[in-house]
Amino acid sequence: MRVILFGATGMVGQGVRRECVLDPEVEAVLEVVRRASAPALGQPGEKVRELVTDNFYDFSAVENAFAGYDACFFSLGVSSVGMKEAEYRRVTVDITLAAARAVLRAGVATFVYVSGAGTDANGRAMWARVKGETENALLGMGFQAAYMFRPGLIVPMAGIRSKTAVYQAVYSALRPVLPLLQRMFPKHITTTGQVGRAMLAVARHGYPKQVLEAADIASF
């Protein structure tokens, strides 16, 4: 399987990247980035390469590079805290759909989008509405398969760290009791590894639901 990955430098994206590198059935990973960076996982060069572009609102200049890939994993996103709706929409809707249209034109069959628990196009919270609109647009875009991932709390594992110090402190504190918390709150807690493995599984084998909640993701 050949995978395109957006958001590889974020916490979730790092987890997805790691699972792709470790999976022997994944033969290639194309990371779409704004700036070239050093590989974060030991010697993945034979499998992982970067596509550098500074325009995430229009991929037409580089979309030929997407041809020949089977699935696109999209984990790029920002927190809505402190953002006005127009600004949040520009990042959450415009970039996501620009990427989706480009990979679809290139013949990519499967699109997997990391959304969030509580996403609802008719919800009261701004972020939930915007993400819900994004999900609906992706589901109606014409991919052979499209899956919306709605994890709750995602705990980083295997040395992966959040770029936000406060979040990382919370994750570090939770890690020793994670197995207990997952049994107590299966609908709300997953790990970066589970998200990555679930993405690979649904892209490879399909899944009966197009929208996967945390409990679905944690089952992989």
Predicted regions located by residue number:
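Short, polar loop motifs at secondary-structure junctions
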Residues: V32-P39
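Active-site beta-alpha turn of Rossmann-fold NAD(P)-dependent dehydrogenases/reductases
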Residues: G7, L76, V112-S115, R150-G152
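Oxidoreductase cofactor-interface core, primarily capturing Rossmann-like NAD(P)-dependent enzymes
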Residues: L22-E25, A121-F220
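Conserved Rossmann-fold NAD(P)-dependent oxidoreductase catalytic core, especially the SDR/UDP-sugar
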Residues: R35, A86-E133, G140, Q144-F149
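N-terminal Rossmann NAD(P)H-binding glycine-rich loop of SDR-like oxidoreductase domains
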Residues: M1-E25
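NAD(P)H-binding glycine-rich loop region in Rossmannoid oxidoreductase-like domains
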Residues: V3, E31, K47-A98, A102-R105
